[in-house]
Curated annotation (Swiss-Prot):
Keyword Isomerase belongs to the record: no
MF GO annotations: translation elongation factor activity
GO cellular component: mitochondrion
InterPro entries: EF-Ts_dimer_sf, Transl_elong_EFTs/EF1B, Transl_elong_EFTs/EF1B_dimer, Transl_elong_Ts_CS
Remaining remarks: This protein may be expected to contain an N-terminal transit peptide but none has been predicted.
Keywords on record: Elongation factor, Mitochondrion, Protein biosynthesis
Native source species: Postia placenta (strain ATCC 44394 / Madison 698-R)
Keyword Protein biosynthesis: yes
HAMAP family, A to Z: EF_Ts (MF_00050)
Family: Belongs to the EF-Ts family.
Listed name of the protein: Elongation factor Ts, mitochondrial 1
Subcellular locations according to the entry: Mitochondrion
């Protein structure tokens, strides 16, 4: 018996079966699923200014049962990693950019946990194969990436930091029914000195985690409200209830100012723009209309 030929025959049969099942369920509605996040490079890390490379993807199926399947979670993890890995830095005013569904579906699937499998199937082929195994429609709803190279040596006072957060996770702590990405900017004449401190790194991690919880836990729709108004959907107007520790009775905007001053990001001779600021955020819920 020729084992290699037998394996090729079996693979062909599995592919043909998956193609038939995918065609059969193509017209079904898929509004369940998970939102996945991945951060390949967070920006300020380990006392250095590095680039930012992250992604958020929503993968859908028909039932919550399949959404809780480990195979589904593994595929979402690989697709999210692929989006973050192949995305190019954006030449636009905004850092967070929608990622083309066509480009992503036609891209080779790149696994972070199983690199030996890289390039053996495209994203769309991997989705089709999962349909063949679970019998449900699997579809991509949306994806976004944030990719920015490190600031040059001519901009030593600027750095970025990306924070990812999910809620209602199952298998993977980077996946849930609600997901968010937030991008922070740090600006200071003393930036290199300040970020070299391990204490500062720990404090920044804590701040990012709290901001992620805040964006998800509150009905957050924007960063600032229009001048002269207060909006419960504006992040900076909300009480910073999701920060664990002193100061969480302040608004998020006031807290960020105090936080930057206490950690010497802002000095008396600094311009007003020095400190820490939320530049952009994205917040998704599974199945919502886009």
């Amino acid at each position: 018996m020729d084992v290699s030929k037998a394996l090729l025959w079996l693979e062909k049969q599995q592919t043909e079966s998956a193609v038939k099942k995918a065609a059969k369920v193509a017209d079904r509605t898929a509004n369940e699923g998970l939102i996945g996040t991945t951060v390949l490079s967070s920006g300020v890390a380990n006392g250095r200014r590095v680039g930012v490379r992250a992604a958020m993807v929503e993968l859908n199926c028909e039932t919550d049962f399949v959404a809780r399947n480990e195979l589904f979670a593994n595929l979402l993890e690989d697709i999210t990693h692929t989006a973050a890995f192949i995305s190019e830095p954006a030449n636009a005013e905004t850092f967070m950019q929608p990622f083309s569904m066509e480009t992503l579906q036609n891209a080779p699937l790149l696994s972070q946990t199983k690199p030996s499998q890289n390039g053996k199937a495209t994203v769309s082929e991997a989705m089709r194969d999962l349909t063949g195994r679970v019998g449900e429609k699997i579809s991509l709803r949306r994806a976004l990436t944030v990719v920015r190279d490190p600031f040059t040596s001519s901009q030593p006072d600027l750095a970025l930091r990306v924070a990812a957060r999910v809620h209602q996770s199952v298998f993977n702590p980077t996946q849930g029914r609600i997901g968010s990405l937030a991008l922070l900017a740090l600006k200071s004449k003393r930036l290199s000195e300040v970020i070299a401190s391990q204490t500062f790194q720990d404090d920044l991690d804590k701040l990012c985690q709290a901001l992620g919880r805040q964006v998800i836990g509150f009905p957050t729709t924007c960063i600032r409200s229009p001048s002269g108004t207060t909006d419960e959907g504006a992040l900076y107007d909300q009480p910073f209830s999701m920060f664990i520790g002193p100061g969480n009775d302040q608004s998020v905007g006031a807290f960020l100012q105090s936080w930057a001053q206490e950690r010497s990001l802002v000095n008396e001779d600094e311009e007003q723009s020095a400190g820490v600021e939320v530049l952009e955020f994205a917040k998704w819920s599974v199945g919502e209309v886009v």
